[in-house]
Swiss-Prot record:
Keywords: Cytoplasm, DNA damage, DNA recombination, DNA repair, DNA-binding, Endonuclease, Hydrolase, Magnesium, Metal-binding, Nuclease. Mg(2+) 2 binds at residue 68. The lineage of its organism: Bacteria, Pseudomonadati, Campylobacterota, Epsilonproteobacteria, Campylobacterales. Homodimer which binds Holliday junction (HJ) DNA. The HJ becomes 2-fold symmetrical on binding to RuvC with unstacked arms; it has a different conformation from HJ DNA in complex with RuvA. In the full resolvosome a probable DNA-RuvA(4)-RuvB(12)-RuvC(2) complex forms which resolves the HJ. It is an enzyme of class 3 (hydrolase). Belongs to the RuvC family. It catalyses: Endonucleolytic cleavage at a junction such as a reciprocal single-stranded crossover between two homologous DNA duplexes (Holliday junction). Binds 2 Mg(2+) ion per subunit. This is Crossover junction endodeoxyribonuclease RuvC. GO terms for biological process: DNA recombination; DNA repair.
Length: 160
């Protein structure tokens, strides 16, 4: 059975997304990219994020959706802004798709590299290796989104 998974790495400047398909025990990268969010008012940026997500859902159907949970930040303003983006993103996913999975950055790093304290570069290296890709994927927002999708695929495999 083929399973299509959307992985999302939410951010206030760029939102990485990745679509993988799990088929016959292998993960295949279908598409990956960025929803670019231009500097503007918070309301406009949230609207851009939601419109970008709408386009992804219009062009693809998914069996599963997984997003990264908010990480700790030292700046309270940053945390509040990210929380608003994540809230809008969560609502949009629930409206379009329904339930979704959430993973902390530590869970994603551990699932992909085996180390909860891995660097973004180590995650990117393992994503490339796990998918058998010949080229590096840039920027790291995209590799993070792929890692989130791979984490969810691995989690589903262990639940079955």
């Amino acid at each position: 059975m083929n399973l299509k998974i959307l992985g999302i790495d939410p951010g206030s400047k760029n939102c990485g997304y990745a679509i993988i398909e799990r088929s016959k025990g292998k993960n295949i990268l279908i598409e990956a990219g960025l929803i670019k969010i231009k500097p503007s008012t918070l309301q406009y940026q949230i609207t851009e994020l939601c419109e970008g997500l709408d386009l992804i859902f219009k062009n693809h159907s998914f069996d599963e959706v997984a997003i990264e949970d908010i990480f700790f930040a030292y700046n309270p303003k940053t945390v509040l802004k990210l929380a608003q983006f994540r809230g809008a993103l969560s609502l949009k996913i629930l409206q379009i798709h329904g339930d979704f999975a959430e993973y902390t950055p530590l869970q994603v790093k551990k699932a992909v590299t085996g180390k909860a304290k891995a660097t973004k570069e180590q995650v990117a290296f393992m994503v490339k290796r796990l998918l058998g890709l010949s080229k590096d994927i840039k920027p790291l927002d995209i590799t993070d989104a792929i890692a989130i999708a791979l984490t969810h695929a691995a989690n589903l495999r262990t639940r079955v």
